[in-house]
Amino acid sequence: MKAQIWNKRIWINSYNPNELKEIFNKYLIDSGFKILGFQEHYFTPIGYTALWLLGESHFAIHTFPEECKSYIEISSCNVEYFNRFLKSVKQYKIIRENETKKV
């Protein structure tokens, strides 16, 4: 296997932790990723961050409720799963995204 990682960073206009966790967990599974672990943290008074450890790398969410948006980032060594995931995310509430990077 060649050492390559595909990465995408996206801002979305949703910041509800329950909605985000449910929809992105589904997108990851439907894309073929193997979820090895999941961690989340709720900030006081508001805010949320979550991290999925994947067999193929990782996915993270960071909410910014005061600005009504969230930042998501996916990194993957499996370009097929990565592209499936991005196709699912395109149906979601994207504000701004960076170009896909292969590292």
Give the location of each predicted region:
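Polybasic/polar functional segments that serve as interface/processing modules
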Residues: 1-103
